[in-house]
């Protein structure tokens, strides 16, 4: 082998010339004590609140308590490999997550790392998880419908784009099913609707079983809805800081769409578990407990999260982020601490009841206790025209039904009211995974409030509805198209709709 001295000396001179003198300076501290997912660290004098710090082995944490002599750090992950005396390094960055369309169709953890085994996510942007909500000036009042595909909700408790509508109820009452159906209902718009109408969906699973989350993802995948959805999962086996962070991470991912003039929907399932995780962190950080041992700022925890859902005005891109937070109650107790907090923050609630669920009324929405504080401004005119009377009729029906239990001799008007109410209640039932388009809901409810169901036995209402829908999709397609494009029922359309339902009703008998 031929070694040339001149060549070697040239290489060495080049290496020496390019040798950098600047040392890499990073501020470090020492772990004083560690346990229960909390580390006390000495020496990080300039650390910021909410800053990400790094432990040996790549484990990350977030500085939450900045005290006189040490820093309380919550650890994202297991604290098993961290020991006293370990070096902790500042990263200089407040906790952030990747955002953008690259996340669609993926399942990520609270820090935005993929957990679905489909390879890395090459997101071009990152954003902080905890940012300030839009102020009053950039907002606009909610005026576009956010269709859930569920008759009971779209007709009676309409949700608009940019609204925060709480889904509240005991365990096993169908809270997650409402969010799932709402996500599935967006598929038709994503397949062949205009870009401006598309609704991108984020689903945050907090403290749930992994099997439940896997099932949710499987349903979305099978029905082609995962392509426009992001799943953020902090399951029951994840550390409390991850469960605390997941809703904020999901919200940031949804805000990307809101701020780029698009529409997004986020479901937090559920915020009771986030509050429990936050309580655990706060108590371990020795913050003083308040009511039900929750820290004093648990209201602020949820208010700053839910205030980020907003409808922006045209100068700011006219985007929106709609939130569907879920709260699980114990024994229908809506007056507990966390439920009352979230009810007071949101723009209405969908109240689900165990009794209704077991009576076979599903979705088990208690129409009397559920409200939407945005109301009919979140409905198209056609829906307002047909659903206006159904609310009053159902309210009267509930009132009468309570008295009718005691009296046997009822006058004809009361009997008529009870019959109509029973059929309307039956009409609002809907099987899971079968969301309806708005114009189809309008046709079905129109049949209900115009007396087409009154002669039918209650048991046949569901069959009539299914038959009517398939008839309208084939024979009455023109009427449905008119309702969809005009978004209102003119006298002409009304006559055509009546005729179509009439001709079906004759063949049904």
UniProtKB/Swiss-Prot annotation:
Main location: membrane
EC number: 7.1.2.2
Cellular compartments annotated: Cell inner membrane
Function: Produces ATP from ADP in the presence of a proton gradient across the membrane. The alpha chain is a regulatory subunit.
Cellular component terms per the entry's GO annotation: plasma membrane; proton-transporting ATP synthase complex
Alphabetically ordered keywords of this record: ATP synthesis, ATP-binding, Cell inner membrane, Cell membrane, CF(1), Hydrogen ion transport, Ion transport, Membrane, Nucleotide-binding, Translocase, Transport
Binding site for ATP: 169-176
Family: Belongs to the ATPase alpha/beta chains family.
Catalytic activity annotation: ATP + H2O + 4 H(+)(in) = ADP + phosphate + 5 H(+)(out)
Enzyme class, UniProt record, top EC level: translocase
Site (Required for activity): 370
Name the UniProt record assigns to this protein: ATP synthase subunit alpha
CDD domains noted in UniProt: ATP-synt_F1_alpha_C, ATP-synt_F1_alpha_N, F1-ATPase_alpha_CD
Residues passing through the membrane, by range: none
GO molecular function annotations of the record: ADP binding; ATP binding; proton-transporting ATP synthase activity, rotational mechanism
Membrane topology reported for the UniProt record: Peripheral membrane protein
HAMAP family noted in UniProt: ATP_synth_alpha_bact
Subunit composition and interactions: F-type ATPases have 2 components, CF(1) - the catalytic core - and CF(0) - the membrane proton channel. CF(1) has five subunits: alpha(3), beta(3), gamma(1), delta(1), epsilon(1). CF(0) has three main subunits: a(1), b(2) and c(9-12). The alpha and beta chains form an alternating ring which encloses part of the gamma chain. CF(1) is attached to CF(0) by a central stalk formed by the gamma and epsilon chains, while a peripheral stalk is formed by the delta and b chains.
């Amino acid at each position: 082998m031929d070694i040339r001295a001149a060549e070697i000396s040239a290489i060495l001179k080049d290496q020496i010339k390019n040798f950098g003198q600047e040392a890499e300076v990073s501020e470090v501290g020492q772990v004083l004590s560690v346990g229960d997912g909390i580390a006390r660290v000495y020496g990080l004098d300039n650390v910021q609140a909410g800053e990400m710090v790094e432990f040996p082995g790549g484990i990350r944490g977030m500085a939450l308590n900045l005290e006189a002599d040490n820093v309380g750090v919550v650890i994202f992950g297991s604290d098993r490999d961290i020991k006293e005396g370990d070096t902790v390094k500042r990263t200089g960055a407040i906790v952030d997550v990747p955002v953008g369309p690259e996340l669609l169709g993926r399942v990520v953890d609270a820090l935005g790392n993929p957990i679905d085994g489909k390879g890395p996510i090459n997101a071009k942007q990152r954003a902080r998880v905890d940012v300030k909500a839009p102020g009053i000036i950039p907002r606009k009042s909610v005026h576009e419908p956010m269709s859930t595909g569920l008759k009971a909700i779209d007709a009676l408790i309409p949700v608009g784009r940019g609204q925060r509508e709480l889904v509240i109820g005991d365990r096993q009452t169908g809270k997650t099913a409402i969010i799932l159906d709402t996500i599935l209902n967006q598929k038709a718009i994503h397949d062949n609707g205009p870009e401006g109408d598309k609704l991108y969906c984020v689903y945050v699973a907090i403290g749930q079983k992994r099997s439940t989350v896997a099932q949710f993802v499987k349903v979305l995948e099978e029905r082609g809805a995962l392509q426009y959805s992001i799943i953020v999962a902090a399951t029951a086996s994840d550390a409390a800081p991850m469960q605390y962070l997941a809703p904020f991470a999901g919200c940031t991912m949804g805000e990307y769409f809101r701020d780029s003039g698009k529409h997004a929907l986020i479901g937090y399932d559920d915020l009771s578990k986030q509050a429990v995780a936050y309580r655990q962190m706060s108590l371990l950080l020795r913050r003083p407990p308040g009511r039900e041992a929750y820290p004093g700022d648990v209201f602020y925890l949820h208010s700053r999260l839910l205030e980020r859902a907003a409808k922006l005005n045209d100068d700011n891109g006219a985007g929106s982020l709609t939130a569907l937070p879920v709260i699980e109650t114990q024994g229908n107790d809506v007056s507990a601490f966390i439920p009352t907090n979230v009810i007071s923050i949101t723009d209405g609630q969908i109240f689900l009841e165990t009794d209704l669920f077991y009576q076979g009324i599903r979705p088990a929405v208690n129409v009397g206790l559920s409200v939407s504080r945005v109301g009919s401004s979140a409905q198209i005119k056609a829906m307002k025209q047909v659903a206006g009377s159904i609310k009053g009729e159902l309210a009267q029906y509930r009132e009468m039904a309570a008295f009718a239990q005691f009296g046997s001799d009822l006058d004809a008007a009361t009997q008529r009211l009870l019959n109509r109410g029973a059929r309307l209640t039956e009409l609002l039932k809907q099987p899971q995974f079968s969301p309806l388009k708005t114009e189809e809901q309008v046709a079905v409810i129109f049949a209900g409030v115009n007396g087409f169901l009154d002669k039918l036995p209650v048991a046949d209402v569901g069959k009539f509805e299914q038959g009517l829908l398939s008839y309208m999709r084939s024979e009455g397609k023109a009427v449905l198209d008119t309702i969809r494009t005009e978004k209102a029922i003119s006298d002409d359309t009304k006559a055509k709709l009546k005729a179509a339902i009439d001709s079906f009703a004759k063949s049904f008998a």
